[in-house]
Amino acid sequence: MVRNMDLYRRSACDRCRRQKLRCVRPLKHGACEHPNNIEALEPCERCSRAGTPCVSTLPPPRKLSRVERLSGLTSVGQLDNLPLQPLIPKQASSHRPGSGSAKSCIPPTGQNKGINDANAVTGSLSMPLPDHRSGSNVHRQPEARPLKRRSRDIHPFGTGSPPTELLDAPSFSTRRSPIFSQAEPFALNDLDFAMQPHSGGDLPSHGDDLFADVLFSPHQKPPAGPTVGESLFDNTKAQELDTRECCLRRLTSLSSRLFHDFNNTNSVKLPDLLSFSPCRNLTAPNQATDCPQNIIGRVLESSHTFLDILHGLAPDPRPTSSSDSECSYSNYWEDDEFVPISDEMTYNSTSARPEFRDSSDMCASSSNRDSSDLSAASPTIDMPTTLTILTCYTWLLQAYDTIFSQIYSSLLAGTDSTSPSMPPVLPGLQIGGFSLDQHCDLQIEILIQLSARMLDRIEGKLGVTDTKDSNAPVDDQEWSRNGSILDTASASTILDALFKQNHSETRAKPGKGARAGSVRNIMKNIRAELTVHK
């Protein structure tokens, strides 16, 4: 009876079906043996009451679903002709623990042969389509998408057979799609989002779009960055320390060499001072050859070496602020004068206007503050290094004093004769082919100019320049005030004490004049003597 009721509900006439009404059609007498036949039904009650013929025609054929269409295709063996694309590598299941073998447990048939061949291509792991197959029957769930829609053009080499060198290519990729085992049914515990490198081999040089997440090869190491606690400026600081230590070693070696060369020059006459002797070249200490030099050449070379060492020990003249101007615009007013403006209820044009100070005073204070900040930030010279520097400077001054004293004595000795004898202090000197061997006065003038300029630069670097007695240019004097490495007061005091012990005529002259009266006054006297003999 239930079956007959189903037939009543499903065998509606055309009129009731068009009006979407319930159609009740009882069975004809003797038609119980064939309940599925629509012709065995009587006209429905609604058509009988309306007096219209009750007609029941066959409905149009229903469209097949995608699952039914695919089932029909697989039944006639058309699955092999579909343009399937590789979805999962063949070796993906072999690297998973517990997967058994790399080969699939499903026997190869004509229906799944194309899928097994296409799955052997190595590529980027995308979301594969789970296949639930038993034997040769292929069944797909209604919720699953068809294989044709799931296939994507991700293989850059076409649909042909993949190259064999890509099967073992390492691929460090973050799997954003789960891995499914072909031997086990699909389950949630089969999802694997771990990073799993493939076995051995080098990265391919082509097909880079397959390895979108490749970082580094196993044979390559990423560039090492700064570790925890390591500063980016450690290397620069280490280089500065190495340069400073090298300058200190050179300074110590120069001090001992100056003592060896100029310790006994006070009692030596001028011909012996001007005589050449083999001496080690200080500008190229690595060379084993010796070059002939006299005392003048050694003093000039030692002065150049000493000046080079002072440049290495000098502080870095980088400004502490990013502004390149001498004074800041914010120095022209005071912040305290703007505070009462907002608190006053009445406006006062006299009191509310800030009083600008003198710009020259502010620039001077700003420059003094910058110099103090620079001196505070620069590394200081310790007392042993200061004494070593002043010792080298004293040896050089003593050598210059000895040389020019002997030259001045030779000039004074020749004043009694009609033709004064001027010693050739720079023999073999030529300027553009012009020989100075017969012009001894020009040789002495050149030596004075060169020695005075060298002493000015050294004293400027030390910070002990006497501006009144110095012949240095204005730019050198300004540079000496800004780039000195020693404290001017303490260095001048030590030098004055050293020179007062050796020069009795300058003991009554306090200050820097005692130090300048020994060498520079002799240079002035020599120039005056040369002017008289012209």
UniProtKB/Swiss-Prot annotation:
InterPro entries named among the record's database cross-references: Zn2-C6_fun-type_DNA-bd_sf, Zn2Cys6_DnaBD
PROSITE patterns xrefs: ZN2_CY6_FUNGAL_2
Protein's name according to its UniProt entry: Cytochalasin cluster regulator ccsR
Gene Ontology CC terms: nucleus
UniProt biased composition (Low complexity): 361-378
Ranges of compositional bias, category Polar residues: 109-125
Keyword flag Metal-binding: yes
SUPFAM superfamilies to which the protein is assigned, alphabetical: Zn2/Cys6 DNA-binding domain
Record carries keyword Coiled coil: no
Bilayer-crossing regions: none
Record-annotated DNA-binding residue ranges: 13-54
Organism lineage string: Eukaryota, Fungi, Dikarya, Ascomycota, Pezizomycotina
CDD domains per UniProt: GAL4
One MF annotation (Gene Ontology) recorded for this entry: DNA-binding transcription factor activity, RNA polymerase II-specific
